[in-house]
Structure formats: C-alpha cells, structure tokens
Amino acid sequence: MALFGSNDVTTAHSDYEIVLEGGSSSWGKVKARAKVNAPPASPLLPADCDVKLNVKPLDPAKGFVRISAVFESIVDSTKNKLTIEADIANETKERRISVGEGMVSVGDFSHTFSFEGSVVNLFYYRSDAVRRNVPNPIYMQGRQFHDILMKVPLDNNDLIDTWEGTVKAIGSTGAFNDWIRDFWFIGPAFTALNEGGQRISRIEVNGLNTESGPKGPVGVSRWRFSHGGSGMVDSISRWAELFPSDKLNRPAQVEAGFRSDSQGIEVKVDGEFPGVSVDAGGGLRRILNHPLIPLVHHGMVGKFNNFNVDAQLKVVLPKGYKIRYAAPQYRSQNLEEYRWSGGAYARWVEHVCKGGVGQFEILYAQ
C-alpha cells in the first residue's frame, strides 16, 4: 500500500464498459469495476454496501424529477438501511427545491422522517472545457447554500427523551453547533474539504422545536449550511453530466456495490444514463469522459511511493458507427467495439490518479 508513508505497493485495477445508443440519442449504459489493495485506507471493520438509484422524469423541461434511492449496508454484522424518495425541481436558474420522505433502520430499530429544502447556487458552470471534454479541474455550480427542514415523528418514549435532551442541550450551551460539525459525519468531511481548499461553513441549527401531529408530537429542525461545490474536480462533474434533466425522457437507474475488508476496497457500478454522449457538431458525437476510477482518483490523493495501475476501457458504438478521433488512441478494434489498455491510456490513468490532468476525447460518427 502506498498511502500515509507506507512503503508497500498500491495496485489499482479498473475495468470500464460504455455501450452507446444510435442516432441522436445521448443515452448509454456504463459498467464500472474498480479494486484497490489498500488496507491502511480501509475502515477498521468490514463494510458491505449496496445502492440502488432511480431517476424518473416528471417535467424534464423544468428539471422536475423524482429520485428514489435505497442504501443497504452491513457493518460489524449490523444491517442498516436508508430509503428516500424525493421530488426535485428548478424553481429558478439559481435555486432548486426538494420535498421528500424516507425511512432509516439500524438493526431492529427503524423510523420514518420527512424533509423539504432548497439549494441556492451562486453560479453554474458551463465552460468550454467541459464541452470539449478535457479533464481539467472544472468547478461545479459554485458555492451552494442549503436550507433544510426536517420532521421526525416522536412516536415512542426513547425518541421523545432523545429529542427533549437535544433541545435542552442547544438551549444550555453555545457549542452545540461545534459538536455537530466536529463529531457528526460532517467533521471528517469538513477536514478533508478544507485540506483540499474547498471551504465549507459549519452546520447551523437555526430551529429546533416540537409540533403536534395527527399521531402525536413531531420534532422539527431547520439546518442551514454552505459548502464549496466549486471545489469538486472533473471526475465528479462527469457523474453529474451523466444526468442532464433535459435529456431524461425515460427513467435512469444506477446499481452500485461497495465492499471493504482487510485486503482492500472493491466497487461495482452498473447504470443507464441520459448523458453519455453529446452532439459535437458536423455529424460527430462526443463520448463524455468516463468517470475516472472513483476510488483511485479520490481515495488515493495521499503521499504514496509505489503505485501501479491496471486499467481497461471498452466502448461499443451503435452499428455502422466508427471512431473518427481518439486521445489516447485505442489499442484494438473489432467492428463497433473498441478497447483501450496499457500504453498511453495507462499513463493517462496513472497521471490522473496522482492528481494530474490530461486529454481524453472520443469522437464518433456514421
């Protein structure tokens, strides 16, 4: 392993497959597999997580979509599950609103909740670099300001006691917001973002009260914070570009799995996306840069000595189509199937995994 001063070798394996639709369709299927032998970077406990995400268009012209997500994990033999369904719409060019509900369960405990909130963006990105599909560090959407209202039914004594204790804690100390920032998940995230130059503000609890509901008391909280969405690098923006709401004329879906143990980390992703290719003019279409090895690109930006990459990419074009330009150049071709591995492609992947940038572009046509 090559993180945090270790002298061991890190080996990252990745295998990507992109299958494109014909005509002017921007849709495509993406299959990704990544495996890294990174014991020191793994959690102390084995983790097993599955994610299912469905995005359904309600009014694509207005960016109105419904997202359904299920997250299931097993950590230290305890099964956890989070189910969420939310409707998201663009209220203005800078403001998105969302309303949803969900359920969380940990072991034998389960509970429902509802939420509504908004995100305000200072600016959106639409740079020429993104359109050209050149993997430079592209900023996403600028700084984002969140205003979230949470409602949790207090339908048992344990929850009521916990809620009353939380209300009392906020009323008796001014450091409660610091506690949220430092000890909740936002703590590690806050540190990581700051070290990467992506400034975020602490989470502030602006409201915490109890209301009466049809079945009893309801705990209501309002959370406000901002984060540096502008600090996201190109690999993340590629994932976002795979979901353009104006192209979402049918449901999109993703199934993913994450496994970690003492031997390393493994990720599997299978998805059908509406934004795998874009019109490049002159009868050409451009394949969006396949999301760079997620674990390697984001999990390996540390101090490492030895680092090996074993990466492959397969692109399957619609029947009758050909690649007109590719950088890095593909290694082999069989009819509409093209493959990349080794050589310039491997050097490009390793360069990106170490924090560098470089050209990746595929143009195809009939």
UniProtKB/Swiss-Prot annotation:
The entry's keywords: Bacteriochlorophyll, Chlorophyll, Chromophore, Electron transport, Magnesium, Metal-binding, Photosynthesis, Reaction center, Transport
One Pfam entry name: BChl_A
SUPFAM superfamilies the UniProt entry points to: Bacteriochlorophyll A protein (SSF51081)
Gene3D superfamilies registered for this protein in UniProt: Bacteriochlorophyll A (2.50.10.10)
Residues that coordinate or bind bacteriochlorophyll a 7: 297
Binding site for bacteriochlorophyll a 3: 298
Keyword Magnesium (UniProt): yes
Function: Intermediary in the transfer of excitation energy from the chlorophyll to the reaction centers.
Protein name: Bacteriochlorophyll a protein
UniProt source species: Chlorobaculum tepidum (strain ATCC 49652 / DSM 12025 / NBRC 103806 / TLS) (Chlorobium tepidum)
